[in-house]
């Protein structure tokens, strides 16, 4: 099986909207970590501050519904998650 070093994926935050409104950002960040750990077998997941800022650009309780992320392997079982930008 081919190693996943660079990968783009879309993460849907539908489950982050369940529960209290002021916990949405925390749940969304935790969802990103859990999804990357599950798909790549990562032990350490580093989230880019620009990605966290783009999730909450409307405020802490009004997060975006979906986000496209780029996952890059930077070490042994260590992954960096960044915001994937469209190239035109």
UniProtKB/Swiss-Prot annotation:
Keyword annotations from UniProtKB, A to Z: Ribonucleoprotein, Ribosomal protein
Disulfide bridges in this chain: none
KW Nucleus (keyword) present: no
Superkingdom field: Archaea
GO biological process, one term: translation
One Gene Ontology term of the molecular function aspect: structural constituent of ribosome
GO cellular component terms given for this protein: ribonucleoprotein complex; ribosome
UniProt cross-references to Pfam families, sorted A to Z: Ribosomal_L31e
SUPFAM superfamilies listed in its UniProt record: Ribosomal protein L31e
Family: Belongs to the eukaryotic ribosomal protein eL31 family.
Name this protein carries in UniProt: Large ribosomal subunit protein eL31
Native organism: Sulfurisphaera tokodaii (strain DSM 16993 / JCM 10545 / NBRC 100140 / 7)
Gene: rpl31e
